[in-house]
From Swiss-Prot:
Entry's family note: Belongs to the peptidase C5 family.
Active site: 54, 71, 121
A GO biological-process term: proteolysis
Taxonomy of the source species: Viruses, Varidnaviria, Bamfordvirae, Preplasmiviricota, Tectiliviricetes
Coiled coil stretches, renumbered: none
Catalytic reactions on record: Cleaves proteins of the adenovirus and its host cell at two consensus sites: -Yaa-Xaa-Gly-Gly-|-Xaa- and -Yaa-Xaa-Gly-Xaa-|-Gly- (in which Yaa is Met, Ile or Leu, and Xaa is any amino acid)
Record note on quaternary structure: Interacts with protease cofactor pVI-C; this interaction is necessary for protease activation.
One GO CC annotation: host cell nucleus
Protein name as it appears in the record: Protease
Species of provenance: Frog adenovirus 1 (strain ATCC VR-896)
InterPro entries: Papain-like_cys_pep_sf, Peptidase_C5
Keywords, comma-separated and alphabetical: Autocatalytic cleavage, Disulfide bond, DNA-binding, Host nucleus, Hydrolase, Late protein, Protease, Thiol protease, Virion
Length: 204
């Protein structure tokens, strides 16, 4: 089941991430059309009207003209298309076209922090947005928010170490949300159940 768009928006707002938050979108997210300020959003790789597929996060830092894409699974472009028929290049291009130079830098997550048995992709996106909000020039690593979780190459996800690491990540993520989001605390029982480990049987 995972998390709904409404739940994710409420979590983001309860974390105090108001300035620059564009909202929750499906695969038709238009990109960052105002590149004069930092902005961020959570985007589904599918059509939300038809149920949605997988949550990822996008952010744009206007100071460094950097476009960040955070996928909790760290899938390659090929895997994103194979699994979800999702491509982000249109979003990247529409953002670049708003700049006079037509030039922006892409930084994309390449490591997995979430287990494939989990439905917590939206919650991991909230963690990334908090990281970007407070550390917009280095949200992917090297700050106390995102460094709460550890990454592993996606090819190692189903290894014993990969399963152990990503399961630990989810436990730390839940503890962080309980500590920092009043909305998550209020709805913790249901949200933890809906995003739990072993929600999907992708490994034994």
């Amino acid at each position: 089941m995972g998390t709904s768009g409404a739940d994710l928006e409420n979590i983001v707002l309860s974390l105090g991430l108001h300035s620059g938050f564009l909202g929750i979108f499906d695969k038709h997210f238009p990109g960052f059309l105002n590149v004069n300020k930092p902005s961020f959003a959570i985007v589904n790789t599918g059509d939300i009207i038809q149920g949605g597929l997988h949550w990822i996060a996008f952010a744009f830092d206007n100071v460094t003209s950097t476009f960040f894409m955070f996928d909790p699974f760290g899938w390659s472009d090929m895997e994103l298309y194979r699994k979800y028929e999702f491509q982000y290049h249109r979003i990247l291009k529409s953002t670049a076209l708003t700049k006079p130079s037509r030039c922006i830098k892409l930084v994309k997550s390449k490591e997995a922090v979430q287990c494939t048995c989990s439905a917590a992709c939206g919650l991991f996106c909230c963690l990334f947005l908090a990281s970007f909000y407070h550390y917009p020039t280095f949200p992917m690593r090297g700050n106390p928010i995102i460094d709460l979780v550890d990454g592993i190459p996606p090819t190692k996800l189903h290894s014993s170490y990969g399963i152990y690491l990503t399961h630990c990540n989810q436990k730390k993520l839940i503890a962080w949300l309980l500590s920092n989001s009043a909305y998550f605390r209020k709805n913790a029982m249901l949200m933890i159940h809906n995003t739990r480990l072993y929600y999907l049987y992708t490994h034994l």
